């Protein structure tokens, strides 16, 4: 006879995550991102990771440490899924402390791990709702363009993002301290 605990184990697909395992405590701040069933680039079983490249990563103090952080994850089942990401809390102005998570106003980074190939892909998302910026009421992703970021770069040896192994070009430019890029046309 199967116990309720065993049944629950099979019903909760998030327990199948192997690559994107969120290691943050819940802060109470969150961001909903919907991945619509119209996405054709994903395979059933792909793991989706939501990142902030400039998240608050310290906890319990006001050291304002910034870095990449995995904030939410889910497994693509072939139909719409919703992933909730964990937001940071910063009460330092009131004599409090910070908790790790995304920072409102930062760009959402979506990565996909495909177990069938063992490759982690970067992505460019198309949003049917929201802007791709943390702090939106919610976001809906209608399409994802996946690429192996280890092969991204430029085939021009004089470029700042030259990669002799690159299989496609990425256009890169700077805006203050932020490096921006897009796939070349």
Residue ranges and their predicted role:
Residues 1-185:
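Primarily marks secretory-pathway-exposed extracellular/lumenal segments that are disulfide-
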């Amino acid at each position: 006879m199967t116990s309720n605990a065993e049944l629950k184990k099979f019903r909760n697909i998030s327990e199948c995550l192997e690559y994107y395992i969120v290691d943050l405590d819940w802060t109470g701040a969150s961001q909903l991102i919907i991945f619509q069933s119209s996405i054709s680039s994903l395979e059933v079983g792909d793991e989706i990771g939501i990142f902030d490249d400039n998240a608050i990563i310290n906890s319990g103090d006001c050291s304002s440490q910034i870095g990449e952080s995995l904030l939410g994850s889910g497994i693509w089942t072939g139909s719409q899924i919703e992933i909730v990401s964990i937001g940071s809390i910063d009460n330092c102005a009131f004599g409090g402390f910070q908790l790790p998570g995304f920072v409102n106003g930062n760009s959402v980074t979506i990565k996909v791990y495909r177990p069938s190939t063992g490759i982690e892909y970067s992505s460019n998302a198309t949003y049917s709702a929201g802007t791709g910026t943390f702090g939106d009421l919610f976001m809906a992703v209608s399409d994802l363009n996946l690429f192996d970021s280890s092969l991204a770069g430029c085939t021009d040896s004089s470029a700042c993002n030259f990669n002799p192994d690159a299989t496609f070009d990425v256009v890169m430019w700077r805006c203050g301290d932020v490096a921006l890029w897009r796939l070349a046309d």
